């Protein structure tokens, strides 16, 4: 005899109605009691769908974060997973293949094949990435090294306002040093925030940082944190410290020197990372570090060290300037969306002008030559209004701020040497334009970061595959049949009786009249 008490309260919705029907047909007296029990209780069925509320979204985000494809970029999880698999004796082929795709060193040619644009950060159509394309990646994977451009823009403003407050020619403006003080602390906090975030990325996702360093364009931004520290040292208010120790200069310039030896050596090596192939306006960041270091060293009273770095910067700036202006076939034309990087042309000569002024203790001929070059490049870019229209906001817009501020600071130095109404007006206009640009770009950055939340999209640069997309079998077969066998390839004679192998494209079209005459 069936006991209704033996029925489990956890009954699936597919069979609880059948249970009631069987009890009804059997005429059991306990049917009403069973029906009341089932109807009165708010029973929880195993197949019941859970509500899609905030808790569900948190669980979904957690599952996305724990995607195994993200683990391949983690610093320790990939090694630990492989060790566990080896201990179990079951290393899966897919995991080994995914690990190979991540850890295999990417060549410069692979970046050029998979990406496009002046900064090589746009994925080509037929390329695939090793991370999910339809999901938002963890924030650290989306935080690029190019974020240090914000630090360059704000810290350079601290230098400019310090120069305005301490220059005799600009005393009529009555600029207080409080502005320099506030901007310096903002720059320091911003640099700490960006550095701590990128440090966590280095610790947790070292493979992503390694891929950025091997990127032929992104590698130039590894100079940005060092240059930002140099700018903080140059813009530090006198109320905080009046004289910096010279040992700080050696401590800051040592990593810049080692990084330059690697980058400049690759430019001259003639390999995949030769300058004629990777030349880009962002390469000016590696040049600016020399002039900024020379400016700081000369401000500290040093002599030989600043001249050494100034000479290196001058030599490589001339080489880079000529290479970029040549527009070699290996360099693609810059599209409209990333035109802000053009303003990096202005940064190096502007900082070089101020550096040589400190080295020579006067705004002499060398300083004026560098300043006039930067001023001409500045106005030649500003006059091209089309550069400022038709592209969306991104971190690349910060390329406007630092060069414009550098030219404004050099103009203030020039107005102090060549006094006059025109130079004073020019310095005020340049300083105002630089300040308004920084305010506008900073406001847009805050809006896109916290309101629209699209400032940091998925960074496809770090997720490209180490292998090129495989071609279709029929295409390979056609290519092999057409050009694979040299002996079966027909040969014809050109008018000079030279044999032309049809294997090598382009194919030669034979004139019909020539064929008739030969017949």
Swiss-Prot record:
Gene3D superfamilies: Voltage-dependent anion channel
Mode of membrane association: Multi-pass membrane protein
Intrachain S-S bonds: none
Alphabetized CDD domains for the sequence: TDT_SLAC1_like
Ranges that cross the membrane: 141-161, 186-206, 221-241, 248-268, 282-302, 305-325, 341-361, 363-383, 390-410, 425-445
Residues modified as Phosphoserine: 77, 85
Region (Disordered): 1-31, 495-519
GO BP terms, alphabetized: intracellular monoatomic ion homeostasis
Presence of the UniProt keyword Transmembrane in the record: yes
InterPro entries: SLAC/SLAH, SLAC1/Mae1/Ssu1/TehA, Voltage-dep_anion_channel_sf
UniProt feature, compositional bias: Polar residues: 20-29, 510-519
GO terms assigned for molecular function: voltage-gated monoatomic anion channel activity
Tissue: Expressed in lateral root primordia and tap root tips.
Residue intervals annotated with topology Extracellular: 162-185, 242-247, 303-304, 362, 411-424
Cytoplasmic side: 1-140, 207-220, 269-281, 326-340, 384-389, 446-519
Cellular localization per UniProt: Cell membrane
Pfam families cross-referenced by the UniProt entry: SLAC1 (PF03595)
Keywords in alphabetical order: Cell membrane, Ion transport, Membrane, Phosphoprotein, Transmembrane, Transmembrane helix, Transport
One cellular component (GO) term of this entry: plasma membrane
Family: Belongs to the SLAC1 S-type anion channel family.
Assembly description: Homotrimer.
Summary of the function given for this chain in its UniProt record: Slow, weak voltage-dependent S-type anion efflux channel involved in maintenance of anion homeostasis.
Name the UniProt record assigns to this protein: S-type anion channel SLAH2
Organism per entry: Arabidopsis thaliana (Mouse-ear cress)
